[in-house]
Amino acid sequence: MAENQNAADQASTLNDERATRLAKRAALFEAGQNPYPEHSEVEDYVVDIEAKYAELADGEDTEDVVKIAGRVVAKRGQGKIMFIVVRDATAEIQLFCRINDMDEAAWNTLKALDLGDILGVAGVVVRTKRGQLSVAPKSATLLSKAVRPLPEKFHGLSDKETRYRQRYVDLIANDDVRETFRKRSQILSTFRRFMESDGYMEVETPILQTIQGGATAKPFITHFNALDQECYLRIATELHLKRCIVGGFERVFEIGRIFRNEGMDLTHNPEFTTMEAYRAFSDLEGMKALAQGVIKAANKAIGNPEVIEYQGQTIDLSGEWASRSMTDIVSDVIGKPVTIDTPVEELAAAAREKGLEIKPEWTAGKIIAEIYDELGEDTIVNPTFVCDYPIEVSPLAKRFEDDPRLTHRFELVIAGHEYANAFSELNDPVDQAERFVAQMAEKAGGDDEAMEYDEDYVRALEYGMPPAGGIGIGIDRVVMLLTNQASIRDVLLFPHMKPEKGFQSGAAAAKAAEAGNTASPFVKPLKPTVDYSKIAVEPLFEEFVDFDTFSKSDFRAVKVKACEAVKKSKKLLNFTLDDGTGTDRTILSGIHDYYEPEDLVGKTLLAITNLPPRKMMGIPSCGMLISAIHEEEGEERLNLIQLDASIPAGAKMY
């Protein structure tokens, strides 16, 4: 209740301040002043002013006129002197405002400013007696009136959901966020320069495709009305780029968006950026050199040392990166030697001992890949090329000549995550056609991520494709690594989010705005949005339990220290919880359809803690989080029980 009241108070305060600012805006228009003028003059930037006048003495004025513009981020003073801090695209600078330095209109403009307004000034460069480099305005122009106030704690907006939904506010409020996206831009530029300097040509391939291919992933499906044709947003650029190799281009690359209709977690977003590159007359060794070269170049471009810190781990990017076979890593994980010749029964038994679920139809290669994915990848810290993938999980890679069960493929793994995937490309059209047929059989068996048969691609291979190496690098993950960000959302300007509760868009928003006669609706007071007439709940149990039985159930308040999606699971979230004992508790819960993991960090939840441990996806789950479930218009709805934050971890519930 206290939490709801606090939110309601904040909404009321926001509405009051916004109304005041809207009134100021209206008054300006009534006075014949446009608070959103078309023209502005900016000739100088703060960072250049700081460099040029670094030696200016304390208390010294110049006659040098500069013209700057920026957002008002601080304001103080009264009477005949005011101090205003503005921020432009490069840095912040103080405006030393003296009433005698300007006309009355300019002074009134400065007096009426609110935090967040965008201001243009012309003035002279001075240094105050206290040593603060400043601009003393001679004229001032309001360039944009901000009618919505900045967050109360301007320097350090911390609520993650607000930061992701309103990235524009996040960029205003947090210097480190702006720096992350500057570095992302530098990394992308470095990738392009590196590739071009190595003789690669950048090309563009279709985003809208008629075949689901190039990767094993679930696509977004749309309809092309003009041709009455079902289409997909691309899940990879691979097959079109290799058509370019067939056509005679020896080195091609593409940096672009990829779309996969799958889950969201710390390292996955439904749309993301990759670089794919293909080089004729090359192989895996050439792709290893490319991966090392471009990532090291990007790391250097943003000013990082060769040894970096990533989420508490020390990563050494220097020297030649290691290469290991997948079977070597799996051997370490299960504690005994494994090869592709190890009997299926033995592999399955070893996997089940580690808590993995193995399907009876799986082959040795599939089981080895599963053990590696679930248990091996996380053990890798420094950059490692994991090589020699089984054919079952590599439908586009070239087979070993001496063992067709293995392929010439590697994944680059750093800090337990994949950053690149590379093949010695399959160029035998008959072999490729057979693998497409096998993929279609898997699709017919219910695997909606399996590739479709691409007849035109097989036809292209029939004309002859030279031996080639190919690689795909996840740009977003590279940015995460080099900027030390834990979540992919922290390196995407506008990550995909679940719909905001109570927030309208499109026609509904326009109708609400028209009804309110404002540019956009005010913050709505908190009120129930559920139509309870359409709710169905499970009937109460008729069987009673005695108090002794009930008292044996240990319900406790727990605080979420960390939460992440479980690999290979679309529903499970892995919670690290503080239960008041001083030892972290792990509980898995199948609620990913309803919650994003990062949104739950810091929350206080209700758990039953004395259930016996139960393995889920190989991870022991010690207890259960309590949720409320009901049906609404035939669909199940789930709400995780969230407690007041003031309740301490470990508090017992009765």
Spans of features found by a protein language model:
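Class II aminoacyl-tRNA synthetase catalytic cores and aaRS-like
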Residues: M1-E543, T549-K559, T581-T583, D593, ...
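Short Gly/aromatic-enriched secondary-structure transition segments
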Residues: V86, L572-L577
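Conserved RecA-like helicase motor-core motifs
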Residues: T586-I587
